[in-house]
Amino acid sequence: MATSQAAKRRAMAKKRAKKKRNKILLLITEFFVLALLVVVVYGVTKTEKVTKVRIDEEEIKAKMNDNVVDSVVLKGYRNIALFGVDSREGSLGKGTRSDTIIIASINNDTGDIRLCSVYRDTYLNLGNDSYNKCNAAYAKGGPEQAINMLNMNMDLNITDYVTVGFEGLIQTIDALGGVYIDVQQNEIVHLNNYQISMVGKTTDKKTYTATEGVDYIAVKEPGLQKLNGLQATAYCRIRYVGDDFMRAQRQRTVLAAVMDECKKTDPATLNKILEAALPNVATSLDVSEMTAMLGNVTKYNITGSDGFPFETNRSTGTVGSKGSCVIPVHLDENVALLHKFLFDEETYQVSAQVQQYSQKVSSDTGR
């Protein structure tokens, strides 16, 4: 009997201790969430530092291809255009060519993200029925024309964008404490040369514009290592190893590494990132959208990345005065592959507009 009562007391004590631990855990969790919210609100108060480039969403929707606006499949995803520009003069809008073009497709239900680089030299309709290398769209009409270019050529419904200057990427990665990248031996010399070009060092051939307040630290060995902001940004820009296709892959690799570090970060570091990044960012997203995305950062996972045109359906060649271009072979086939990759549409039928643009690209390039 005494043994039974002692067992009951031990069980009750264990239960009370468990409840106490759960209560403490709940308090710690609530404190952390509150702290995170405070930091997010603090960051939102700084959104006047973000460059707001006005875009006409209704005009963008008016230029979308047949059946895109009402697509049931596309409504299950949030598609955002990401642009990276080399603008140390502070210009993030029209007049600056986009060195980086990435479609980020977020599954609304799962939080899974798939990234697709659009190779900047791809020969496409620029969104105004003229044809050239696709990165010219941003230079000619800023983010709005670049979004139209993506939507029209690829049957997409993008209405939002984020543009980051390379200096913003440098500062963001430094605020995170660096990112881990596996650097190959044949990439080191080019990585260091791009660093030199961005910090204002002088070489025998050329004097470069300085990136203020950034020091050059040479990468000396291959292998997995932590790169600082300048090193990682220089890594993104390498195009002499694997050409522009590998360059785009490196950009996606760095973006994924940044995402991994952000998911592990604490509120104080998040504050540093906001301070560093916001002055070098232009976006169409409003305060509530940015707050919601920051609040869901732990939900997001990058589950796939690729490049457009796809490896099996592209070639390179000279297209008259446009010079050397990446040529989709053929555009309509690549768009079908894109919808399979981003949205799991196995038998996607491209729009009549994409068929028309595909014929024009083939006619101009002879492919």
List where the protein language model places each region.
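Entry/capping segment at the start of metal-dependent catalytic domains
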Residues: T3-G111, A292-G295
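C-terminal solvent-exposed extensions
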Residues: M64-D70, Y77, L126, N280-R367
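Solvent-exposed, acidic/flexible segments
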Residues: V73-N79, V85, G93-R97, G127, ...
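Extracytoplasmic
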Residues: K75-R78, T96-I101, T110-V118, D129, ...
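Second-shell loop/turn segments in exported
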Residues: E89-L92, N132-K140, D155-D160, P222, ...
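Extracytoplasmic/secreted envelope proteins and their assembly/folding machinery
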Residues: S98-T100, Y131, P143-N151, F166-I170, ...
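Amphipathic, coiled-coil-like alpha-helical scaffolding segments used for oligomerization/assembly
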Residues: K140-D204, A210, S284-D286, M290
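Flexible, polar/acidic helix-loop-strand segments at domain edges
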Residues: D174-T269
